[in-house]
């Protein structure tokens, strides 16, 4: 009856016998992971770190040292530079570097003033002269910054900050080449040395 039931289900006697032998095999029982092996006591350091890892961390030769402050400053500047600078803006700065700039205050046109009464009060005169000097410097800066003549004062100052970062980066790039006698008088080397950097 049992043999007929096994045959009806499509299971032969050899399969049943092999299955029963495999269940009682000591080798298989040793290979199967036990439930308590999968649990970890997170309060014990030995479960988290092996002795080799602990020895590695305690070795003073493997301690990480902080980089010098100068390196950190350069890294911060490069990160800000990469965020603020795109390829088109960088090409615009490259072209502006090779263009001559006239920053003579006498050649900077002054804005037309309306006919207003000028006070003779000493404090008013000093304040007016201070504002005139600031306005003159802003007009000169607009001629230096690429595209600054078409910007308002706030946008031009933001562009001046980015342009200054670009120029500082160019100085750092060209300093090693100036020590080996590179012809730095030619502005075209700015593009060459910049593009040759990794």
From Swiss-Prot:
Induction (UniProt): By FUL, which restrict its expression to the margins.
GO cellular component: nucleus
SMART domains: HLH (SM00353)
InterPro entries tied to this protein: bHLH_dom, HLH_DNA-bd_sf, IND-like
Chain intervals for the UniProt region annotation (Disordered): 1-33
Key words, A-Z: DNA-binding, Nucleus, Transcription, Transcription regulation
One Pfam family matching this protein: HLH
Example of a GO biological process term: polar nucleus fusion
Superkingdom classification of source: Eukaryota
Protein's cellular compartments: Nucleus
A single GO molecular function term of this UniProt record: protein dimerization activity
Known tissue expression: After fertilization, it is expressed in stripes about four cells wide at the margins of developing wild-type fruit. Also expressed in the inner valve layer, which becomes lignified later in fruit development. Detected in roots.
This protein's name: Transcription factor IND
Organism of provenance: Arabidopsis thaliana
Lineage of origin: Eukaryota, Viridiplantae, Streptophyta, Embryophyta, Tracheophyta
Gene that encodes it: IND
